[in-house]
């Protein structure tokens, strides 16, 4: 019913619809305070969103076994099949019934929301590389606007405009339009805003529009993940009005909203940022930011020491800041340098626990680096797109703008931290660990220029399926096997939906990959095209199922979480090595494309894996791959390129070169 909801759509055009908004605004509602003035309130659809379905247990088991088939030999598969049968007719059935009953008692949320927060917040590994991803902005099309001060000012103002637009209910609701000509119109919006919010979703559904969950948006601003022993906490203070700025590992704060909730004038923000950029303070000997890259239990203990050493107020300022702006003192050399800098940097100039860091380098290269427990990038991508659009189309200042004559020495406060010997030792240890880990990470990227979405759609193939098939072929060529593969899919079409997994490795991709890699000369171009079409069709089915909450991963995860919560001995299905193997995602993949995104990326989720960020554009395909020493990212990309060349040859009726 709904295609994959990866929120690829560029947010609607200037949404200053006719008619003033029909709700009270904050005192600061003058010109330039908002990105848009939606006539449909931002949260209009939230109450009536459908609930995330719990799949039938037999469907989950069937899908699980289908995903296991290409990964196991016949003997292993028969064992796993038996474990599944026992589970489905025994303890699994009981757990499923309990999960359904529990879900009925909690209609305000989804069955996955609580367990998913638990999973993220209980993880003790560093958030850096293990969880936090990044998305890099395209440069401003007007090159002179890429000056660091100009871009930092414009992006900060646009970010605060987004905050105000969201909080005053004037941000267009996030809606996936299957037929925009019918639903993405002022006429429809004028009608739907009068439908009570308890029914509004149904009104949108009638015109093939699918409103998406926006419950994660409130954590975008003024929020931080706080380290605590055994399970972290999310902290939000939406009363705070200050911005946190990091430069050379030094911390600065100044207000970006005044007491009435107005945005401080752009020329004042420019003046304060100019003051920070020209501050000659040296980098601190013990950069505090390293601590946010530590193991969470170690960081929790050190944070307690920080608090008891007289730093409570300074930490509160860091945690409650609207967001963290990181100003880097060097230009970006190339795309690989961009990825390394935005994914981890040198550890001194990021607060990795903040809901997001907006990073701007000396040459204006910019990115959002975000903490993953509070949300899945749904809110981040919308924010990202709107900030790019606003800051490039309606910039608050020009490169010629003069900063205000504000007294930044008074307004900008530099935070100083009192460090005991124990804290200094902790920072030094964190730095050593950080530096050693980062040395092990390799990143490389590919731009395949022969074609993209337009050509593949003419061939009646899913562009995403072809990209995923290329990864399967590449891994088979490089390592001779088919491995567990993960593709993230948003379930934001449902209330408090998070993500579901698409499992791109299938019996179809395995057969097709083996034909292309091992014996291309034995097949005609027509036969290879036929196999690609089968892969595309099956991938499309998996994608649709995942977007509708009909995968198997989250359901099995929730049943396991429930068993643990009830103190039940772990069922044998979960002790089966095949279950461990399918959740050891050697290929972890994620896609997004938007006119604002230059590239995105993340680290592998296992030590012998690849982290694959990719995008299929109109006429080219981009791929950004990370690996640790156990795998070779550059060679993998050479194999991806070979796979794409071979598939394009087959589609053009040419024979495959071995």
Curated annotation (Swiss-Prot):
<feature type="modified residue" description="N6-succinyllysine">
    <location>
        <position position="439"/>
    </location>
</feature>
<dbReference type="InterPro" id="IPR000542">
    <property type="entry name" value="Carn_acyl_trans"/>
</dbReference>
<keyword id="KW-0472">Membrane</keyword>
<dbReference type="InterPro" id="IPR042231">
    <property type="entry name" value="Cho/carn_acyl_trans_2"/>
</dbReference>
<feature type="modified residue" description="N6-succinyllysine; alternate">
    <location>
        <position position="510"/>
    </location>
</feature>
<dbReference type="GO" id="GO:0016746">
    <property type="term" value="F:acyltransferase activity"/>
</dbReference>
<dbReference type="GO" id="GO:0005743">
    <property type="term" value="C:mitochondrial inner membrane"/>
</dbReference>
<keyword id="KW-0012">Acyltransferase</keyword>
<keyword id="KW-0813">Transport</keyword>
<feature type="modified residue" description="N6-succinyllysine">
    <location>
        <position position="85"/>
    </location>
</feature>
<keyword id="KW-0809">Transit peptide</keyword>
<feature type="binding site">
    <location>
        <begin position="452"/>
        <end position="464"/>
    </location>
    <ligand>
        <name>CoA</name>
    </ligand>
</feature>
<feature type="modified residue" description="N6-succinyllysine; alternate">
    <location>
        <position position="239"/>
    </location>
</feature>
<feature type="modified residue" description="N6-acetyllysine">
    <location>
        <position position="305"/>
    </location>
</feature>
<feature type="binding site">
    <location>
        <position position="488"/>
    </location>
    <ligand>
        <name>(R)-carnitine</name>
    </ligand>
</feature>
<feature type="modified residue" description="N6-acetyllysine; alternate">
    <location>
        <position position="418"/>
    </location>
</feature>
<keyword id="KW-0999">Mitochondrion inner membrane</keyword>
<feature type="transit peptide" description="Mitochondrion">
    <location>
        <begin position="1"/>
        <end position="25"/>
    </location>
</feature>
<protein>
    <recommendedName>
        <fullName>Carnitine O-palmitoyltransferase 2, mitochondrial</fullName>
        <ecNumber>2.3.1.21</ecNumber>
    </recommendedName>
</protein>
<feature type="active site" description="Proton acceptor">
    <location>
        <position position="372"/>
    </location>
</feature>
<feature type="binding site">
    <location>
        <position position="499"/>
    </location>
    <ligand>
        <name>(R)-carnitine</name>
    </ligand>
</feature>
<dbReference type="GO" id="GO:0009437">
    <property type="term" value="P:carnitine metabolic process"/>
</dbReference>
<feature type="modified residue" description="N6-succinyllysine; alternate">
    <location>
        <position position="544"/>
    </location>
</feature>
<feature type="modified residue" description="N6-acetyllysine">
    <location>
        <position position="79"/>
    </location>
</feature>
<comment type="similarity">
    <text>Belongs to the carnitine/choline acetyltransferase family.</text>
</comment>
<dbReference type="GO" id="GO:0004095">
    <property type="term" value="F:carnitine O-palmitoyltransferase activity"/>
</dbReference>
<dbReference type="GO" id="GO:0001676">
    <property type="term" value="P:long-chain fatty acid metabolic process"/>
</dbReference>
<comment type="pathway">
    <text>Lipid metabolism; fatty acid beta-oxidation.</text>
</comment>
<keyword id="KW-0496">Mitochondrion</keyword>
<dbReference type="InterPro" id="IPR042572">
    <property type="entry name" value="Carn_acyl_trans_N"/>
</dbReference>
<comment type="function">
    <text>Involved in the intramitochondrial synthesis of acylcarnitines from accumulated acyl-CoA metabolites. Reconverts acylcarnitines back into the respective acyl-CoA esters that can then undergo beta-oxidation, an essential step for the mitochondrial uptake of long-chain fatty acids and their subsequent beta-oxidation in the mitochondrion. Active with medium (C8-C12) and long-chain (C14-C18) acyl-CoA esters.</text>
</comment>
<feature type="modified residue" description="N6-acetyllysine; alternate">
    <location>
        <position position="239"/>
    </location>
</feature>
<dbReference type="InterPro" id="IPR023213">
    <property type="entry name" value="CAT-like_dom_sf"/>
</dbReference>
<feature type="modified residue" description="N6-succinyllysine; alternate">
    <location>
        <position position="418"/>
    </location>
</feature>
<feature type="modified residue" description="N6-acetyllysine; alternate">
    <location>
        <position position="510"/>
    </location>
</feature>
<keyword id="KW-0808">Transferase</keyword>
<feature type="binding site">
    <location>
        <position position="486"/>
    </location>
    <ligand>
        <name>(R)-carnitine</name>
    </ligand>
</feature>
<feature type="topological domain" description="Mitochondrial matrix">
    <location>
        <begin position="209"/>
        <end position="658"/>
    </location>
</feature>
<feature type="intramembrane region" description="Note=Mitochondrial inner membrane">
    <location>
        <begin position="179"/>
        <end position="208"/>
    </location>
</feature>
<dbReference type="GO" id="GO:0008458">
    <property type="term" value="F:carnitine O-octanoyltransferase activity"/>
</dbReference>
<keyword id="KW-0443">Lipid metabolism</keyword>
<feature type="modified residue" description="N6-acetyllysine; alternate">
    <location>
        <position position="544"/>
    </location>
</feature>
């Amino acid at each position: 019913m709904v295609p994959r909801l990866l929120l690829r759509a560029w947010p609607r055009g200037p949404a200053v619809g006719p008619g003033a908004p029909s709700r009270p605004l904050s005192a600061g509602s003058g010109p330039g305070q908002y990105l848009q003035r939606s006539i449909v309130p931002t949260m209009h659809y939230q109450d009536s969103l459908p609930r995330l379905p719990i799949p039938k247990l037999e469907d989950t088991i069937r899908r699980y076994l289908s995903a296991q088939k290409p990964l196991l030999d016949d003997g292993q598969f028969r064992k796993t099949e038996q474990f599944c049968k026992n589970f489905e007719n025994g303890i699994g059935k009981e757990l499923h019934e309990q999960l359904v009953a529990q879900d009925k008692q909690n209609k305000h949320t989804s069955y996955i929301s609580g367990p998913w927060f638990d999973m993220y917040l209980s993880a003790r590994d560093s958030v850096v590389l293990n969880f936090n991803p990044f998305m890099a902005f395209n440069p401003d099309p007007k090159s002179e606007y890429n000056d660091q001060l100009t871009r930092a000012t414009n992006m900060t103002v646009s970010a605060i405009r987004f905050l105000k637009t969201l909080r005053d209910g004037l941000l267009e609701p996030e809606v996936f339009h299957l037929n925009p000509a019918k639903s993405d119109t002022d006429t429809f919006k004028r009608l739907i805003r009068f439908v009570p919010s308890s029914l509004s979703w149904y009104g949108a559904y009638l015109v093939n529009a699918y409103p998406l969950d926006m419950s994660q948006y409130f954590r975008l601003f003024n929020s931080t993940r706080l380290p605590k022993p055994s399970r972290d906490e999310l902290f939000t203070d939406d009363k705070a009005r200050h911005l946190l700025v990091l430069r050379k590992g030094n911390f600065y704060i100044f207000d970006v909203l005044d007491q009435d909730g107005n945005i401080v004038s752009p020329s004042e923000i420019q003046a304060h940022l100019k003051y920070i950029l020209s501050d000659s303070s040296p980098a601190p000997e013990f950069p505090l930011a390293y601590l946010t890259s530590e193991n969470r239990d170690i960081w929790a203990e050190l944070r307690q020491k920080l608090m008891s050493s007289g730093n409570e107020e300074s930490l509160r300022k860091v945690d409650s800041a609207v967001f963290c702006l990181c100003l880097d003192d060097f230009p970006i050399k190339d795309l690989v340098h961009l990825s390394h800098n935005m994914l981890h940097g040198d550890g001194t100039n990021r607060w990795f626990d903040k809901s997001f860091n907006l990073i701007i380098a000396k040459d204006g290269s910019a990115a959002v680096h975000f903490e993953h427990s509070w949300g899945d990038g749904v809110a981040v991508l919308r924010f990202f797109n709107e900030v790019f659009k606003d800051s490039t189309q309606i910039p608050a200042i020009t490169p010629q703008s003069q900063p205000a004559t504000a007294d930044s020495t008074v307004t900008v406060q530099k935070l100083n931290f009192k460090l005991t010997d124990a804290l200094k030792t902790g920072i030094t240890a964190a730095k050593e660990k950080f530096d050693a880990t980062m040395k092990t990470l390799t990143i490389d990227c590919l731009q395949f220029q022969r074609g993209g979405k337009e050509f593949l759609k003419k061939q009646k193939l899913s562009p995403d399926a072809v990209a995923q098939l290329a990864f399967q072929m590449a891994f088979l060529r490089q390592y001779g096997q088919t491995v567990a593969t993960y593709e993230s899919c948003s379930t934001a079409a449902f209330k408090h939906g998070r993500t579901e997994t698409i499992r791109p490795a299938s019996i179809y991709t395995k057969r097709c990959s083996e034909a292309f890699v091992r014996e291309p000369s034995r097949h005609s171009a027509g036969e290879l095209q036929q196999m690609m079409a089968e892969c595309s069709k099956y991938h499309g089915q998996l994608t649709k199922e995942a977007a509708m909450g009909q995968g198997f991963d989250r359901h099995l995860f929730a049943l396991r979480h429930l068993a643990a919560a009830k103190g039940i001995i772990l069922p044998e299905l979960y002790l089966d090595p095949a279950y461990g193997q399918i959740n050891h995602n050697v290929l972890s993949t994620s896609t997004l494309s938007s006119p604002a995104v230059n590239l995105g990326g993340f680290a592998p989720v296992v030590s012998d894996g690849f982290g694959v960020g990719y995008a299929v554009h109109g006429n080219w395909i981009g791929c950004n791959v990370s690996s640790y020493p156990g795998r070779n990212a550059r060679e993998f990309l050479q194999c991806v390129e070979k796979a794409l060349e071979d598939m394009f040859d087959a589609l053009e009726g040419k024979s495959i070169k071995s």
